[in-house]
Amino acid sequence: MARYNVLLWDKDNDLYETIISTDNRETAETVANSLNKFVHQDRLLSMNNREPFDAVYIEDRMYKEDNLEYIEYKD
């Protein structure tokens, strides 16, 4: 069974913060798309450096292989 993690990416520190972990792809996509609106508006700040996050990813963890799926990168 696949496990989907929704991650926020802090480019400056190359850190990922997991927001939710679920076995439901639709739930992961809904959360990622909702978060992406806030990331695009610079409204979600990294706890590490208090700077806005740079992107939202869905991590598909199936058979212990990590696969980061790019949602959107803000310019």
Report each predicted region and the residues it spans:
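Compositionally biased, low-complexity intrinsically disordered regions
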Residues: M1, D14, E26, E51-F53, ...
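Short, mixed-charge low-complexity intrinsically disordered segments
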Residues: S34-D75
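Generic ordered-secondary-structure signal
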Residues: W9, T18-I20, P52, E59
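Short aromatic-glycine-(Arg/Gly/Cys) micro-motifs in beta-strand/loop hairpins
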Residues: M1-T18, L45-M47
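A short, exposed loop/beta-hairpin motif centered on an aromatic-Gly-Thr core
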Residues: D14-T30
